[in-house]
Amino acid sequence: MTEEKNEILKEIKRSFRSMMNGVASHSMREKGVEYKINWGVNLVNLRMLASKYDKDFELAIALWKENIRECKILATMLMPADKMDAEIADIWMEQVVSQEMAEMLALNLLQYVDYAPEIAYKWMASDKPLYQLCGFCIIGRLFSNGQEPNERGINEYVD
């Protein structure tokens, strides 16, 4: 990662302190949502922060590597969908530890990738609850955007 990207990452991480919500963070921790750091920043503030930056593959990868809730959510907002290949999607999904993150990954990023229907059906058929949730979120967004499933997709959806 370039020095410039590293500085942007540091700037982003510093900005969380001013937006922190200790009550929300504590509540999430009590409910079992574990991250190295969880500032409890709400999604509105994270969207406003993300709007200050262009989509950026390197920055998104660096953000995702941080075990910080807000960094991971921002990564889903800043990753260009056309650069998010299926292998990275699988790696990120393996690292999802909460319902919130499965939803953020689906709604902010994976619904926009070219292979969205394929991973949605695959994950819906998984025996892992977070994969299922993410798959159903993706397919729900695709349906709400007017996409129609093919015959295989219909069979997967009704099973």
Predicted regions and their residues:
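Alpha-helical scaffold domains
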Residues: M1-D159
